[in-house]
């Protein structure tokens, strides 16, 4: 079966690359065998494609052999040596520009290894890294932000209100010292500068929900600045907005809550409070100042013993107090008439997100028919929904559970001193838990006494005000 003239011409074109490659590096067996003779039958499309691919591979192999024969042996080795040097220089340059991307130190690697071995698998998704030193801090981080970050990392600031106020005051200093680069405007570049400060703070400790809401407010105010304003005018306007936020959403809101919650305290009440809440403390002190007679039960828990701060403050104002640990809660609950709790945040489904142990106290109060009153400012309300405290939480260092001393100045390691070297021993310290809305009798905010399920309505109302 013969070929036509057109088919022979087409085959000649297909064979031309093979002849060129064979002239460079010699004819390989694969190339020679791939030539189609006139007596062979016509190939299908799939077979022709495979044949063409084999010819290309043979051509590349022949060129590579020819190049290897022409180049001396030392050239390729020199190129191989030069490439790592180039990459190492790029890595050094990148590490100088951004110290966070520099190679990890032995201490960091050791800490990471220990954590991975001692990690509770169900909480492996939670961030555990904490920057507790000033090592490898980016050069654009403001000293005031570094100071705040170290305080947050070492748990020197108690309460979400105080953390938010300190954050906004720190950003006031950052804005005052900020200089707009040439070719940009304040409203366009300041947000980038603020983002780098926030990234450093997040590396020291996860931001609270109240801090996140305050940051969103600040970024919104920066974005709506008039582009025609001078830098000094824009800074002055931002500083006024920050002062207004602290005054209206935190301080005055707390004062309104104090007035509303005090009305719920009657003479002869036994009020139970947990750990240290600045809003609840203000409620109890104000009730004492207006002449109401009551007693307070301060419930505390390890490892930070924040309840001692509350106990000291209340006793200084002449309030009769009883101090118990959370393990004795069931014995003291029969005396309690009302429970006042502070809130880290109020979730959109009406749940209370607060310090670990709050849910236990609310449950015992609900079962004992004791009203549970949550005091929380509206700037802590969030659209987030949580059904448990597993998906989102904050991991505290396990070393906090080692010290068995009764105060911060007593070091008493106890049996957990060498817990990192004990096989199959893991320590878990969670900061927060979630109290379902059915356990909360009423939520007191600056809008009044409301059911906890009204959180979405309050959020929408404030969105319209600040839109």
From Swiss-Prot:
InterPro entries: IF-2B-related, IF_2B-like_C, NagB/RpiA_transferase-like. Gene3D superfamilies: Translation initiation factor eif-2b, domain 2 (3.40.50.10470). Signal peptide: none annotated. The modification Phosphothreonine is found at residue 27. One of its GO terms (molecular function) is guanyl-nucleotide exchange factor activity. The modification Phosphoserine is found at residues 16, 19, 21, 23, 28, 37. The keyword Acetylation does not apply. Changing residue 248 to K: Increases guanyl-nucleotide exchange factor activity on eIF2. It is found in: Cytoplasm, Cytosol. Transmembrane segments: none annotated. The keyword Phosphoprotein applies. This is Translation initiation factor eIF2B subunit delta. It comes from Schizosaccharomyces pombe (strain 972 / ATCC 24843).
């Amino acid at each position: 079966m013969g070929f036509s003239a057109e088919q022979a011409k087409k085959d000649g074109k297909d064979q031309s690359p093979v002849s060129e490659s064979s002239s460079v590096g010699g004819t390989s067996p694969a190339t020679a065998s791939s030539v189609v003779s006139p007596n062979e039958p016509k190939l299908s499309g799939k077979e022709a494609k495979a044949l063409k691919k084999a010819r290309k591979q043979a051509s590349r192999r022949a060129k590579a052999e020819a190049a290897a024969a022409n180049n001396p042996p030392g050239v390729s080795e020199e190129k191989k040596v030069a490439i790592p040097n180039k990459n190492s220089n790029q890595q050094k340059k990148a590490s100088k520009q951004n110290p966070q991307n520099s190679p990890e130190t032995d201490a960091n690697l050791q800490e990471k290894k220990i954590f991975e071995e001692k990690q509770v698998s169900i909480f492996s998704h939670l961030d555990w890294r904490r920057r507790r030193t000033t090592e490898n801090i980016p050069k654009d981080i403001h000293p005031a932000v570094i100071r705040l970050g170290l305080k947050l990392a070492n748990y020197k600031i108690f309460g979400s209100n105080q953390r938010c106020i300190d954050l906004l005051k720190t950003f006031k200093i950052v804005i005052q010292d900020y200089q707009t680069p040439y070719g940009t405007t304040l409203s366009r570049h300041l947000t980038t500068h603020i983002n780098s400060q926030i990234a450093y703070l997040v590396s020291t400790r996860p931001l609270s929900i109240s801090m996140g809401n305050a940051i969103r407010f600040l970024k919104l105010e920066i974005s709506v600045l008039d582009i025609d304003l001078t830098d000094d005018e824009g800074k002055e306007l931002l500083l006024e907005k920050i002062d207004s936020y602290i005054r209206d959403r935190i301080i005055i809101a707390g004062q309104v809550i104090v007035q509303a919650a005090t009305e719920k305290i009657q003479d002869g009440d036994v009020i139970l409070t947990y750990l240290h809440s600045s809003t609840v403390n203000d409620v109890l002190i104000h009730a004492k100042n207006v002449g109401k007679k009551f007693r307070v039960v301060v419930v505390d828990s390890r490892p930070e013993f924040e309840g001692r701060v509350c106990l000291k403050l209340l006793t200084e104002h002449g309030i009769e107090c009883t101090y118990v640990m959370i393990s004795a809660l069931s014995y003291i609950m029969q005396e309690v008439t009302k429970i006042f709790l502070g809130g880290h945040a109020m979730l959109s489904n009406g749940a209370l997100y607060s310090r670990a142990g709050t849910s236990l106290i609310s449950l015992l109060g609900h079962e004992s028919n004791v009203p549970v009153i949550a005091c929380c400012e509206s700037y802590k309300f969030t659209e987030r929904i949580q059904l448990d405290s597993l998906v989102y939480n904050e991991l505290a260092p396990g070393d906090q559970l080692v010290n068995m001393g009764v105060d911060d100045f007593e070091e008493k390691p106890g049996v957990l001193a060498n817990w990192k070297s004990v096989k199959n021993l893991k320590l878990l310290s969670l900061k927060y838990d979630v109290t379902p809305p059915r356990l909360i009798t009423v939520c007191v905010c600056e809008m009044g006494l409301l059911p906890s399920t009204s959180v979405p309505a309050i959020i929408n109302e404030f969105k319209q005000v600040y839109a």
